[in-house]
C-alpha cells in the first residue's frame, strides 16, 4: 500500500518537473525558438487553434522565426494573435508567411527574466512539497501501520522530494545561464 503511495507521489513530482520544463521553454532568451509561440491561439474559422497546429514554424537563423500557415487566409489572424499574446514580438507578414525578428535582450530585460524564473521556481517547489505532504498524510491514514514504517516512508518521500527539488534547481540554473549569455 505504501509503495503505491510512494510511486504515485513520484509520478506527480515527475509531471510537475515536465510542466516546469515546458514553462521554461516558453521564456524568451534572445534566440529564436518556435516554443515561445506554443501558447498562441489563433481564431481559425470560428474556433481557437494553437498556432503550431495550423502552420509550420521554423528558425532558419538564430534571430528569426518564420511561420508558414497551411492556409494563407489565416495570416492576418495569426499576426493579430501573436500581438495579443503579449510576447514582445513584432511579426511582419507578406502574402505567404510571417517573419518574426528576435531582437537581442537588454541587460535589464535579462535580469527581470531571471527574477521571473526564480519566482516561478518557488511555485513549482511548493507543488513538489505539497505532493510530499499529501503522500505523508495518506501514509499516516493507513490503519495498523507501525510508527517505524511511517518514519521509513517519510524518509523515502523526503529523498524523492530532494531529488526533484534538485532537478528544479538544476533546470533553473541552466535557464539562468542561457538567459545571461549574450
Swiss-Prot record:
Keywords: Cytoplasm, Protein biosynthesis. GO terms for biological process: translational termination. The keyword Cytoplasm applies. Its main location: cytoplasm. It comes from the Bacteria. Pfam families: RRF (PF01765). GO terms for cellular component: cytoplasm. GO terms for molecular function: ribosomal large subunit binding. InterPro entries: Ribosome_recyc_fac, Ribosome_recyc_fac_dom, RRF_sf. It is found in: Cytoplasm. Signal peptide: none annotated. Responsible for the release of ribosomes from messenger RNA at the termination of protein biosynthesis. May increase the efficiency of translation by recycling ribosomes from one round of translation to another. Belongs to the RRF family. HAMAP family: RRF. This is Ribosome-recycling factor. The gene is frr.
Amino acid at each position: 500500500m505504501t509503495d503505491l503511495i510512494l510511486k504515485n507521489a513520484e509520478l506527480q513530482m515527475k509531471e510537475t518537473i515536465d510542466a516546469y520544463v515546458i514553462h521554461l521553454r516558453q521564456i524568451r532568451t534572445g534566440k529564436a525558438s518556435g516554443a515561445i509561440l506554443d501558447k498562441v491561439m489563433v481564431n481559425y474559422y470560428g474556433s481557437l487553434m494553437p498556432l503550431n497546429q495550423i502552420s509550420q514554424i521554423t528558425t532558419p537563423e538564430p534571430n528569426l522565426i518564420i511561420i508558414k500557415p497551411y492556409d494563407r487566409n489565416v495570416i492576418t489572424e495569426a499576426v493579430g494573435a501573436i500581438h495579443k499574446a503579449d510576447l514582445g514580438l513584432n511579426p511582419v507578414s507578406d502574402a505567404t508567411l510571417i517573419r518574426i525578428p528576435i531582437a537581442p535582450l537588454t541587460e535589464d530585460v535579462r535580469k527581470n527574466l531571471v527574477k521571473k524564473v526564480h519566482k516561478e521556481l518557488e511555485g513549482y517547489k511548493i507543488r513538489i512539497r505539497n505532493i510530499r505532504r499529501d503522500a505523508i498524510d495518506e501514509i499516516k491514514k493507513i490503519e495498523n501501520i507501525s510508527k517505524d514504517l511511517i518514519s521509513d516512508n517519510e524518509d523515502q518521500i523526503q529523498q524523492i522530494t530532494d531529488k526533484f527539488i534538485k532537478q528544479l534547481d538544476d533546470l533553473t540554473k541552466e535557464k539562468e545561464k542561457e538567459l545571461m549569455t549574450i
